[in-house]
Regions:
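Acidic, glycine-rich two-metal-ion catalytic cores of nucleic acid-processing enzymes
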Residues: 204-302
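N-terminal leader/targeting and assembly helices and adjacent pre-domain segments
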Residues: 1-205, 296-302
């Protein structure tokens, strides 16, 4: 069983890294915001018609830019290149691809952050668990096949990782779609042309700079950190033969009622289910679980 000191160390490690990633996310969205407004401004100044045919060289350049990304954002790349390669691409398809590039770049960076989280947090949990076993070998036992058991239990969460990855790409796609609509209005309406920059800001960073697609990405990162921490902790418990865990609600003024209501409740590890009795219970959840010491003796007595 981890000491309170080791628990705090693990929490700081997981959410400290997450906080650094969130700062980076804010910077990336601000940068994308500037680039996208630059692309829209250039398009509007060119005074080309929204529905007119795109030049072949411009299309080839846009396709080349889109194809520089890795497989994590392949669905996004395929979607935006298809409109340039199939049929007769228009200026609208071209400008959409150009505003998509900065956001797909953000999406790729988000995937990289989550992959790092997905490796770092389980490694930290395993490392601290082994250190605790050295300090208190009777209370925190590590079996000889711990690493094998840990790997088997950890491999069961691959499908959940896919769902988180889909959320990132969906968030990026929705932002691009909304920006395309802003660009179309600006191209076809004089009043909208004056306001497009504010509209792009609202979509990407929110009205006051703390919302929009950036806030959605930050939420995904916090939720994924909580997911990784609790899945890694659960895998550690199963590998060490721990049978029960206690739900620990985030000790903060913004803790939700559902999490607060089950704070301290004890559950069987085999019954653990994310969103029911295992964090994350909801987006932005930062709750955790701790081991419940088995007080049963060799004869089954408490």
């Amino acid at each position: 069983m981890l000491s309170k000191k080791q628990q705090r160390r693990l929490i700081r490690s997981a959410y400290g890294t997450s906080a650094q990633f969130i700062k980076a996310i804010k910077r990336m969205y601000r940068s994308a915001d500037r680039q996208i407004k630059g692309e829209i401004s250039a398009f509007l100044m060119s005074e080309v018609d929204w529905s007119s045919p795109a030049e072949k060289d411009d299309v080839e350049d846009a396709v080349a830019e889109l194809k520089q990304f890795d497989s994590s954002v392949a669905p996004l790349v395929a979607f935006y290149t298809s409109s340039l390669l199939l049929g007769h691409p228009k200026q609208s398809d071209l400008v959409t691809a150009r505003v998509a590039v900065p956001l797909i770049k953000v999406g790729q960076s988000l995937h990289e952050m989550m992959q790092r989280n997905g490796k770092k947090i389980p490694n930290d949990v395993s490392k601290i668990s082994k250190e605790q076993a050295v300090q208190t070998p009777r209370l925190h036992q590590i079996p000889y096949n711990y690493n094998i058991e840990l790997q088997q239990n950890s491999s069961q969460v691959i499908v959940q990782h896919k769902g988180i990855s889909d959320n990132v790409n969906r968030n990026i796609h929705q932002a691009i779609t909304r920006i395309r609509e802003v660009c179309q209005r600006a191209a076809q309406d004089t009043d909208a042309k004056r306001d497009y920059a504010k509209d792009v800001d609202r979509i990407l960073t929110g009205k006051d700079g703390s919302g929009g697609a950036s806030a959605q990405a930050e939420m995904i990162m916090r939720t994924q950190t909580c997911h990784e921490l609790n899945q890694a902790t659960t895998a550690d418990f199963k590998a060490r033969g721990v049978s029960k865990y206690r739900f620990l609600s985030l000790e903060a003024v913004n803790s939700c009622e559902d999490c607060t209501n089950i704070d301290g409740n004890v559950y069987d590890i085999d019954d653990a289910q994310e969103g029911v009795n295992l964090p994350p219970m909801h987006p932005n959840c930062q709750c955790w679980i701790e081991e419940v010491e088995d007080t049963t003796d060799d004869y089954g007595n408490q």
